[in-house]
Structure formats: C-alpha cells, structure tokens
C-alpha cells in the first residue's frame, strides 16, 4: 500500500477519482538506491502502523511484519497465515482498516495496484499450501531422499496442471490493473 498526505491527495483529482495518477511527470529518480526500502520507518508512519495493528488485533487479525517497501511512500503489512477463506477475509479487513486509520492520521491509503507510474506497484495476494486433514504439508521437501518422494510427486502434479491449464489460470487471475502493475 502507499500512504500520501491527505492535503496533497486532495490536490489531485485523478487520485481522488481513480486511486492512481493519470498524468504527471515521471519521478526525478528511480529506485536505484533502495533508500526507502532499507531506511527507518518515519515516526508518523510508525504511529500509523501501530494503530493499524491495535485495530486489527481487536478483530483477531495479526500481522507478521510491516515495513517500508521499495517505492517511495510504499509500505507492506503481511498478515499471519490462515486458511484461504479466512485469509481472504483478513485481507479485506486489513484494507478497510488501512484506509480508515490513514484518515485518522491525516493521510490517504492508496490500494490501487499501480498508483504512480515509474515506480513499483502493489500486490494483494493470498499464498496457498496443500495440507492433509492430518496436518501433513504436501509441499514439505523433507530431509531425506525417501521423504522427498511425496513432495516431488505433488510438485510434479502442480507443474503439470499449471502447464495444462495455463489459459484458465490466466483468465481467472489477469485483469488490466494487475497487468498495469507488472
């Protein structure tokens, strides 16, 4: 997600109406130095992140990490893993909370995949795994060649399915916003 000062946000009708810039100059400098990514979190942003965490904890959503991301004003929050349907709900709660708490801190939270041209975009996704009802992780490679058999078989099946059903996967996941982000 990106955080921008609310006063600056309100000066941009394109941000207000679309959640991203539609015109304007490219950034004067790219992301070559990683100064934002490896920099310390500014106090205002840290206070925002703290308040977001408090609100999320109240509704049972815990985040594993939060940090600066590569692009200027870009940040990340990663919720703790959960079953897919719960994780999707958590993502929705997180996005609503980010927007609400940003307003309380005099900022706007941009959740568009690519709010600014010339810098990294943001992605919202759910990781997945395959676990049996007994709790066995089917994607655990194990530590011995014998333990690798199950992992290799499952991985081979996944790769075969992705190769065979590539068009269906693309149709179910591609959209203009995601293509623009990449």
Language-model features, listed with the residues they occupy:
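Glycine-rich, acidic/polar active-site loops that bind/position phosphate-bearing ligands
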Residues: 2-111, 116-182
């Amino acid at each position: 997600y990106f955080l921008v000062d609310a006063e600056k946000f309100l000066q941009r009708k394109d941000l207000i109406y679309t959640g991203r810039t539609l015109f304007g100059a490219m950034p004067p400098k790219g992301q070559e130095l990683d100064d934002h990514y490896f920099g310390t979190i500014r106090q205002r942003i840290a206070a925002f992140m703290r308040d977001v965490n408090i609100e999320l904890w109240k509704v049972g959503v815990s985040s594993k990490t939060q940090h600066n991301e590569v692009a200027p004003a870009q940040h990340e929050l990663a919720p703790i893993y959960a079953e897919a349907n719960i994780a999707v709900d958590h993502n929705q709660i997180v996005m609503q909370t980010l927007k609400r708490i940003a307003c309380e801190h005099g900022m706007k939270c941009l959740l568009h995949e690519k709010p600014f041209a010339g810098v990294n975009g943001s992605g919202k996704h759910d990781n997945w795994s395959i676990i049996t009802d007994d709790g066995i992780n089917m994607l655990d490679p194990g530590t011995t060649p014998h333990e690798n058999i199950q992992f290799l078989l499952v991985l081979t099946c996944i790769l075969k399915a992705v190769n065979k059903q590539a068009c269906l996967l693309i149709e179910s996941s591609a959209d203009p916003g995601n293509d623009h982000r990449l």
